A protein has these predicted regions:
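Amphipathic alpha-helical and helix-coil boundary elements used as assembly
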Residues: 1-465
């Protein structure tokens, strides 16, 4: 439809001076509208603009029929007085901007969850309708982390994993997103239309070098034309037997009518490179151990907004030293311990859990830095002090190795020494003392000496010198 007039509501203009509209893949649609308002309307406009305003811009045909040009949220405005006239400018943005207001910290640690389910879960927190034009049923198979990103930024990054993109709805109230290219209508291309064709070589090389290997230069051939007709992203046309799809629109208000410039490309050329989690590289997130399995752990991230999720991903646990043959240090944390989930690079799938972090405690074990203590939750302990090593079960049994006094072994039960060959006990300068409250028995094969209220000897021969 060719417009005869343009009208706006609920904020209207006496005279429209200028309109600019831009729409593109992975971008919020925006329209800037400038015009005159009456003095009486200024106060009413300011009252309306105190809250969220959904502004609808329509083209009015010669016979009074209407067609929506743009419908979005007023995100900025200005009113100025010039030569006794009030000029107002509105910036209107598609409802997708509601997803781009706040940053979030969420983890998705269910490796059986699909990307589509992640989209659905987050959209459920808003009044957002999302239409999947491409399949997104793949399971994540790894950690998916939303780190200091808005939901809009997060959705774009997830979409890029399939070389896809988001397209916001620009002709309805509310928020609707398309994952992938919307199914548009065919454009009846007229041979009388002026057009331009150009090759986006910079875009081609950028995509090629970022993992999109099956793209060719001809896929990045752009077709551009200007008409008065109102089309939308996803509409397509055939030119020389090739289908070109609208991926970008720039509209201007020229001499009382809207002129639309459309950019089209083959669908294959619209693929976007995979976007990495750049701002999380090197970050460490405070977490609590949920479960331990062999040399891996499950964790709950303390700052996670997604608290009610099912967690079934185990992360490698960093240790002091380890080799594939099992050589090294094996000392795993316990459930409830505080640790750190570390993202070493730009892919959250590479995450691992780092060493435990000391929490506030009144335990005397952590008061003296000169004391090094290795202790389990079962109270089994090895303690290194400046002048001793103590091994104890904290239940009456211990071995002390001290610099001045030597070795002190205390047992709450029996002490058993066994050897396949000799056992030698000797003292270079002191005495050898064997003492027992009940008795003392020295035995060698069939010969024995028993000290029990008296001395008993058993054997074939006794020699006394």
């Amino acid at each position: 439809m060719r417009e005869y007039n343009v009208k706006a509501a609920p904020i209207s203009f006496l005279t429209i001076l200028d309109i600019k509209k831009e729409e593109e893949l992975n971008c919020h649609g925006k329209m800037t509208m400038t015009g005159y308002i009456s003095d009486d309307e200024e106060e009413e406009c300011l009252k309306i603009l105190r809250g969220d305003v959904w502004e609808k811009i329509e083209a009015v045909g010669e016979k009074g029929d209407t067609e929506i040009l743009f419908w979005g949220l007023v995100t900025d405005f200005s009113i100025e007085r010039i030569n006794d006239q009030k000029k107002m400018t509105l910036e209107i943005t598609t409802g997708s901007c509601l997803l781009d207001r706040e940053v979030h910290m969420r983890s998705f640690q269910n490796q059986n969850m699909t990307y589509k389910e992640i989209f659905r879960q987050i959209c459920g927190e808003y009044e957002v309708d999302i239409i999947f034009e491409s399949s997104l049923e793949d399971k994540t198979g790894q950690l998916v982390l939303q780190y200091a990103e808005t939901d809009w930024e997060f959705f774009k990054r997830l979409s890029s994993r399939k070389n896809r993109y988001l397209v916001p709805e620009s002709k309805m109230r509310g928020t609707r997103l398309f994952y992938g290219l919307p199914r548009g209508k065919k454009i009846d291309f007229s041979k009388n239309w002026d057009y331009k064709m150009q090759k986006d070589l910079a875009g081609f090389y950028r995509k090629k070098s970022n993992g999109i290997l099956d793209i060719s230069e001809s896929d990045c051939l752009a077709f551009i034309f200007q008409v008065r007709e109102n089309y939308r992203i996803g509409d397509y046309m055939e030119f020389q037997g090739i289908q070109f799809y609208i991926y970008k629109i720039i509209s201007k208000y020229i001499k009382g009518e809207m002129i639309h410039e459309y950019y089209l490309m083959q669908e294959k050329g619209l693929a976007v490179p995979v976007d990495m989690l750049k701002n999380a590289a090197g970050c460490s997130l405070d977490a609590m151990v949920k479960e331990v399995k062999e040399d891996k752990v499950q964790v709950e991230i303390l700052s996670d907004e997604n608290k009610q999720q099912e967690i079934n991903i185990f992360y490698p646990y960093a240790t002091v030293y380890s080799t594939p043959d099992g050589t090294g240090w094996y000392c795993m944390p316990e459930p409830g311990d505080m640790v750190r989930l570390t993202i070493p690079g730009k892919q959250e799938g590479e995450a691992f859990v780092n060493s435990s972090v000391h929490a506030e405690t009144e335990s005397p074990d952590r008061k003296d830095p000169d004391f090094k203590v290795l202790k389990t939750k079962y109270q089994k302990e090895v303690r290194f002090t400046p002048n001793s090593i103590v091994i104890t079960n904290n239940q009456g049994t211990r071995i002390e190795l001290t610099d001045k006094e030597g070795i002190h072994l205390v047992s709450a039960h029996s002490v058993v020494l066994e050897a396949a060959e000799d056992v030698t006990i000797s003292s270079d300068k002191g005495s050898l003392i064997a003492a027992g409250t009940s008795s003392v028995l020295l035995k060698q094969k069939g010969t024995s000496i028993t000290l029990d209220k008296g001395i008993s000897f058993t054997g074939g021969e006794l020699r006394v010198q």
